[in-house]
Design a protein with these regions (language model features):
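Metal-dependent phosphoesterase signature
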Residues: 57-92
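Alpha-helical structural motif
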Residues: 16-19, 57-58, 70, 158
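C-terminal cap/substrate-recognition subdomain and adjoining C-terminal extension
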Residues: 1-5, 76, 83-204
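Short, charge-rich amphipathic segments
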Residues: 23-33, 47-60, 88-101
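Generic detector of well-ordered alpha-helical segments enriched in charged/polar residues
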Residues: 21-25, 39, 59-63, 74-79, ...
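A structural signal for alpha-helix termini and helix-coil/disorder junctions
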Residues: 29-30, 47, 51, 67-68, ...
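Short, compositionally biased "basic patch" segments
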Residues: 45-71, 132, 136-137
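Active-site neighborhood of HAD-like aspartate-dependent phosphohydrolases
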Residues: 1-50
Length: 204
């Protein structure tokens, strides 16, 4: 019998809102969020037109709002945010993942958002913490730079993270039956890699 692996996108799939946007709103208020996005509007428009890389736009936004912030203070901010906003995770998703884990299924959340705030949100929401593979943020001289360390966990990188998970567990792809859950273009490759996929689930 094959091992079952359940791979979930985070923002929009498990959550009702974009967690990075909500973190910025939490830290800077709605006015600060809007002003910061307007200051970077050119790059956001270029990204939507596929003329500017998604990961570079993310770096600009993160650097604008959090660049230079002490990493410890940023993690405190993320934990406080998670304490309030773990309820942004869809109840249907919580119930299904809790059930999968209780039955011995393996769950990995593969997220383009940073682990700094996704991890505490998952820890607050679920009975048992799922495996998380998200984007990592660069820290230099003890401060958040706004740059991504390694690769943005988006598109093909999500497949790479799933492969890394399998390699770490010393199990071949052929031994897994993979389920993928996503809601956007960034999940396309992951959903194609899976044996079975679900687009925009948990919305009933």
């Amino acid at each position: 019998m094959k091992h079952k692996l359940y791979c979930f996108d985070f923002d929009g799939t498990l959550t009702t809102k974009d967690s990075m946007i909500e973190l910025i709103r939490y830290a800077h208020g709605t006015k600060g969020l809007i002003l910061g996005l307007l200051a970077n509007i050119w790059y956001l428009v270029m990204m939507k037109l596929h003329l500017y890389p998604n990961w570079r736009s993310k770096e600009r936004i993160l650097a604008h709002f959090f660049g230079g912030m002490p990493a410890e203070a940023f993690d405190v901010l993320c934990n406080n945010f998670a304490a309030l906003h773990h309820t942004d995770i869809r109840p249907q998703a919580i119930a299904e993942i809790n059930d999968i884990i209780a039955q011995g299924g393996k769950v990995i959340v593969v997220s383009a958002s940073a682990e700094n705030w996704v991890a505490p949100m998952l820890a607050k929401a679920f009975n048992s913490m799922p495996t998380l593979s998200g984007t990592h943020l660069e820290v230099k001289d003890g401060k958040i730079t706004g740059k991504i360390e390694g690769h943005n966990c988006y598109g093909e990188e999500k497949v790479n993270r799933i492969k890394e998970y399998m390699q770490a567990n010393d199990i071949e792809r052929a031994e897994y039956y993979i389920y993928a859950y996503g809601d956007s273009q960034g999940d396309k490759q992951m959903m194609e890699y899976a044996d079975e996929s679900f687009y925009k689930p948990f919305r009933q």
